[in-house]
Amino acid sequence: MFYSFLVSPEHRDYLRFLWYQDNDPNKELIEYRMKAHVFGNSPSPAVATYGLRKCVDGADEDVQKYVCENFYVDDGLISLDSTKEAVDLLKKTQEVLRKQGNLRLHKIVSNSPDVMAAFKKEDLDKEMKSLDLDKDNLPVHTSLGLSWDLSSDVFIFNINFPEKPDTRRRYL
């Protein structure tokens, strides 16, 4: 997603890197400048968040609220009351992001097979593409470090307590 946001020409000097000519270590190093934001660059998440929010300026209020309040970088998590409401919101958001920012809202996951059936296979998360939504049980999905059992619609928390001896210092 970061690659969708261009770096302004006056800032490209700050995003330089060296690479061997023709990818051959025996040849000279060439200096390149990034034209787009890349994964691993510190400001990229903030740029992506800003870009997403800018894309929905002027959109319907529900789309703006979804993107501005329910996204963390490029993951949107929301709970809605009905299948129709979920499908309508996601489709409207897909359309706005595509038109306003040439961004693709995909990797869709839901605890409702009906919601996922409303979208093309390429819009679904990779784990969901191979499922037969009429027959298969929905798997456990992990997003933002949180495990979600789609079948029972519950979150799963895995907590690992370190093995440390009981001492006064530890408790005081």
List PLM regions with ranges.
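Conserved acidic
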Residues: 1-172
